[in-house]
Amino acid sequence: MSVKTAPQRRLRRRRRVRAKVQGTAERPRVSVFRSNRGITAQLIDDDSGHTVAAASWTEADTRSLPPMEQATRLGQMLAERAKAAGVDSVVFDRGGYRYHGRVRAFAEGLREGGLKV
């Protein structure tokens, strides 16, 4: 039987992508969550299971921005925090979302911030 609802399809894609994407201490995984209101992302070292840095749309300087600008700014903020933690390169885990729109803007913000994605 096929999976028909959009959230179920996203979860299947997420599991498939997650099986292939692994973060390490020197190259952590950037996990992205997209909701209707905003984006949340975190840098995860899968070897130790710890979050290195995080950024969320609920932070004061991004709350009032339009969605695409918000995603780009969050990418830049997370890149700054990653640099402060000594991270230069990351693995991008799109979380089952298509690489389009806000997810793409977030990834471009990471690159603008100086991270190698």
Where are these regions (language model features)?
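Ribosome large-subunit tunnel/peptidyl-transferase-proximal elements
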Residues: 2-117
